[in-house]
Structures are given as structure tokens and as C-alpha cells.
């Protein structure tokens, strides 16, 4: 069994497929890659044991072919090839790779000494009979990866807040910060795992079909399919309370240059010590937003672009959280709402963020 294809095409496919590997040493399959040619359609498959990534290409010459290889070794070898074409040939328990030279990759075996067969959960998933079908845009997915991802809970494995709440809107939170994007994707809300959302970034087609059935969700576009399980715990997700916070009215608001405030925070960060717990003072003055380190060794005022219902207000806020949330914005100018004792709100188009203030004895 042998296949031959353009080196550039195989490199492109492998560079995408490798992103589906989690390389968990406790779960060997997460470090493997399936290579399958059926009816001239080549498919590379990888998994993290929950999500499966399929990268496909049609019109590939060769006999039907199926093999499972060590993903890292295969990926690194293919990336270093400079020949015009690459040939893959299965001989016994080895995969021959011919390009600039001839290389033999030893193939993994199961407990009975047979070549490993890669599971394919798509075989039992019938797109025609799924409960719900939707279509989303790749640009929307990439917007969510930019603005919502930084607000996910990354410190509590298994928490429902590690996932994206996707329904009438898209929400992410770690209880200290919230991000809500006013885009309706699904009629019935689900929690999408962060690993699955990350895999969608390898897609290149703008239109993506989404198929949801019980605890399974599949994203499919030209040449790429992502199969996985929804994150459990949606009944524990306090979406009503979170949405209420996003909709809070603040007495005052202003707008500032995104670049100007980020540059000021970057300079001020040099004067924030470990005992400050990343806290800085943010004061809304008549001239602009004053940013001050706790020891007053660094201070800077970012001028307003606009200001409405001004009233001087001071709070302590985590500089890392503030920087991360502002960096996620796309527009050059951001609107900041303030005046409540517990948090501030940042608005950028259809994106709303809430950042909780830090407790401080001086305030």
C-alpha cells in the first residue's frame, strides 16, 4: 500500500492535524495520528481523548491505505522535507517515508502485537438525524477566541466555567471577570469545551455546519471536522445572574484610546511588586483615567476621548486582568463605565466585559 502527494499539501495537513494531539502520556492514543486513504480521500485524525480532529483532502493518488503513526515523529519529519513529493508506503510494522531520502517509522502495536486501529466516533454519528443543526461563521469563532477566551476559568478543572456558554449569546467567566458577546449561535444553550473551540481555528472555510445531538457536537467545514462532547454542568451555570451583571447600568462612562491605556498599563506594570498582588489604583478624574501603583512610585493619566456624567471615582483593580481584557478588544476606542463599588464595565461593539475590583484597606 502506497500513496504519493505534494510535500506542501501534506505539510499543510499535518501542521493542522497535530494540533488535535494532547500528548497525554497516560493516554497513548493522544500522541498518535491516523492516516487513512479511502476512495482517493486522505484523512488525518488526531485526538485528546475527548475531541477528534479530522483533516481531509480529496483527489489523492494511491491505493486504499490506513495506518497509525507516532504523531510527533511524523509531524517533525514531514515539516523538514523539501522534496517536491512525498511517498508513504506500509511495509510490515513500518511506514516508509520517501522524500529527500528514505525513512522508516516504527509503528505502534497493541497488546496482541497487531497494528493499532484508531477509533472513529464519526462512524456512529449520523448528521442527517441529529437533533439540532446550525451554521456559524469562522469570523465569529475567531472573534470569540479573541474576546471571550481570556475570561474563561483556567484554574478549576472540571468547573462548568472552564467552557463557553453558547446560546442566545456567548458568555465566559471565572467569577472575577465576565465577557459577553451579543451573538446568537444556538437555540438551545450548550457548554463548549475550550479545547474544542481552539481546534476550530484550524478551519479555513467561512461557513461551518454545527450538529448537536445529546452530549455530542460536531463542527464541519470543507476539509475539516471537529467531533467532541459538550462540557457537563450547564444546569450549574448561573447564566441569569451573570447576564444581570452584564446588563448593569453604571452612573458614569468615558471612552479612551485602547493603545494609550495599554501602553500606560505596560509602563506601570514595572512598578507593581509582588506584595501588591497585582493591584493598582484606577481613578476617574476630570482630565482622564489616572493609573497609580500602590506605592505611588508610578502614575500616569490617560486622557478621555469622551466623558459623560463625570464624577470622580477611585477603585483598586488587578492590572493583569485589566490588561488582558482590554487587549481582547478589536476597536481602537473603548468605552468604560464606572461609578459602582464592585466592578467596572468595558464595552466594544457587541462585546461587554465586567471586571471585579480588588479589596483594599486604603479605599
List each model region and its residues.
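Structural preference for solvent-exposed beta-strand-turn elements
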Residues: 1-363
